[in-house]
Amino acid sequence: MTRGLAPLLPIEFHKMGSFRRPRPRFMSSPVLSELPRFQAARQALQLSSNSAWNSVQTAVINVFKGGGLQSNELYALNESIRRLLKSELGSFITDYFQNQLLAKGLSFVEEKIKLCEGDNRIEVLAEVWDHFFTETLPTLQAIFYPVQGQELTIRQISLLGFRDLVLLKVKLGDVLLLAQSKLPSSVIQMLLILQSVHEPTGPSEGYLQLEELVKQVVSPFLSISGDRSCSGPTYSLARRHSRVRPKVTVLNYASLMTTVGRPLNEMVLTPLTEQEGEAYLEKCGSVRRHTVANAHSDIQLLAMATMMHSGLGEEAGGEDKHLLLPPSFPPPHRQCSSEPSILDSPDELELEDVASGSQEDSELNCASLS
């Protein structure tokens, strides 16, 4: 058997080696051999990205001009933006929308308002804001739904653009003073909504100019300068309680903010985090989102409630030794409310049980005597 296998080995190796073909000159690397195919694929991808972005740009400008989306156009735009996010342009979509598309679209809105003078300008501004807030803004959010902003969402970017490129350029200072008696409610809504949007870097010059406009139509008004000191009804109420009951530790809004170790203006003007886009929904699923817009007011109410309840407790322990319960109101909307109740602590629930038990005993005694 060894004699039969020995002569076959060189023949097999010779056959296997016969299939090898020499590589052409200058094509020894496999990367260089596939370079033309890579270049063709890259050019096709760039053409696809350009066509997708052109369709998005055309749709956005059409929305600013007052037009709408056609049937199934929103789905096609979302798919185009998803392809753009996976391309080299993905990291520049938000910047390009803010600096190019939004600026170009809002220029049409500004020109429409500047054509009118006096009271007519206020009426046109109210109409423009109603259309922008109810039609344009939701459509922009729907078109750029796949985009997940890093610092600002599409909604915040659009509102800041309307503030800087439309409202502050039409110069409404003198017009607002003359038209205060017949000022449309849409203008007041516009000023308050724009005031609620803050830049990540803190209050800018545009925000300070907006505050000057809000002061003319909203009273009372608490500006950035007013936040530096505890003034107004809150301060007078805290001072009155501290004078009557010197032992009570007053927990006010200013001390609560300073204990955190951050400046008060920085805390109050910190922009609210709005989570949008598909990345956030994939992370959270169907969890209900709660707003934090009233976080500071909730802290202030909690501080005042704590101060008042502690003061009532001291009065009860001083002379009469009576058990004073906090006023309990029937919660008709408790099942639908997402805000925590201050009066739902375990100790207060026990006090309510004791009070209800004593009330039942007194009723039984009265029934036995009768």
Curated annotation (Swiss-Prot):
Keywords: Phosphoprotein, Signal transduction inhibitor, Ubl conjugation
Entries under Pfam families matching the protein: HbrB
Segments traversing the membrane: none
Region ranges (Disordered): 312-346, 351-370
Coiled-coil spans in chain: none
InterPro entries: Bit61/PRR5
Phosphoserine found at: S28
GO molecular function, one term: ubiquitin protein ligase binding
GO cellular component terms given for this protein: mitochondrion; TORC2 complex
UniProt PTM comment: Ubiquitinated. Ubiquitination by RFFL promotes proteasomal degradation of PRR5L thereby modifying the substrate-specific activity of the mTORC2 complex. Ubiquitination by RFFL is stimulated by LPA/lysophosphatidic acid.
Tree of life domain: Eukaryota
GO terms classed as biological process: cellular response to oxidative stress; negative regulation of protein phosphorylation; negative regulation of signal transduction; phosphatidylinositol 3-kinase/protein kinase B signal transduction; positive regulation of intracellular protein transport; positive regulation of mRNA catabolic process; positive regulation of phosphatidylinositol 3-kinase/protein kinase B signal transduction; regulation of fibroblast migration
Quaternary structure, from the entry: Interacts with the mammalian target of rapamycin complex 2 (mTORC2) which contains MTOR, MLST8, PRR5, RICTOR, MAPKAP1 and DEPTOR. Interacts with RFFL. Interacts (via C-terminus) with ZFP36 (via C-terminus); this interaction may accelerate ZFP36-mediated mRNA decay during stress. Interacts with RICTOR.
Family: Belongs to the PROTOR family.
Job description of the protein: Associates with the mTORC2 complex that regulates cellular processes including survival and organization of the cytoskeleton. Regulates the activity of the mTORC2 complex in a substrate-specific manner preventing for instance the specific phosphorylation of PKCs and thereby controlling cell migration. Plays a role in the stimulation of ZFP36-mediated mRNA decay of several ZFP36-associated mRNAs, such as TNF-alpha and GM-CSF, in response to stress. Required for ZFP36 localization to cytoplasmic stress granule (SG) and P-body (PB) in response to stress.
Protein name: Proline-rich protein 5-like
